[in-house]
Amino acid sequence: MIHSDSPCLRIQNIFQRHYQRSTLFIDDSGAQSFDDDAWRLERSQRNRMALFDMHKPVIAQIHGRCLAGGTDLAMLCDMLICADDARIGFPATRGQGSPPNHMWLYMLGPQWSKRLLLTGDQLLGSDAATLGLVLKSVPADRLEAEVEELADRLAQVDTDLLAANKRIVNLGLELMGAKTLQRLAAEMDARGHLAASREEFRKQVMEHGIRKATRMRDAPFGDGLARP
């Protein structure tokens, strides 16, 4: 990703997120202090922030399931285009923690951010477009062509101007506290890791495996969809 930000390359970055199922990472290395956990999360966060900070535009192409860490990455891109039937959300808030990157507030506003994060429910791609979480949704068989068409249009513009116009919008987000909120998000995730439900989920994973533990966690929520 950093290499593709070279000023010598006239190319736009298309970041594809496609999950057949939710992917979860369980750290079973032993207990960490709150401070150690927060620092670990911030170190990982700095790598993801390259998407936000790099000069060239990055388009997120979302199909399938974009859940948990997938949303951390996709929402740092400059524009998000998804399939109508994609599913976007952070179901780990039901038992494990909080998003370690937080752009939800800026893209959805406070009420819908809370609606999704307080339940772990997901949005279909078409609904995500209606609410402004993504730029646009299209039928799945049109997704790649739609993203390529936008990338081709961006490629007609001088890279210095692309960088300038991306940067001023992102600086506006920074003036609204976006960079500070990311650090606070890492700390809130570390705080969430102290919840009794996280330890219970870890035990379920050790006993039943990740798939069954996830099904047990999600069973009370039905189809897990939030409908505008």
Name each model-derived stretch.
Residues 37, 45, 111-112, 163-164, ...:
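Short alpha-helical segments used as structural interaction elements across diverse proteins
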Residues 38-40, 78-89, 178, 212-221:
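Short, charge-rich amphipathic segments
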Residues 42-45, 144, 148, 166, ...:
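Generic alpha-helical structural signal
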Residues 2-24, 124-125, 156-228:
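C-terminal alpha-helix plus adjacent terminal tail
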Residues 11-63, 101-102, 214, 218-228:
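An acidic, glycine-rich surface segment that forms the CoA-thioester-binding/catalytic face
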Residues 30-31, 37, 41, 144, ...:
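Short, structured helix-loop boundary elements
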Residues 49-162:
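Crotonase-fold acyl-CoA enzyme core
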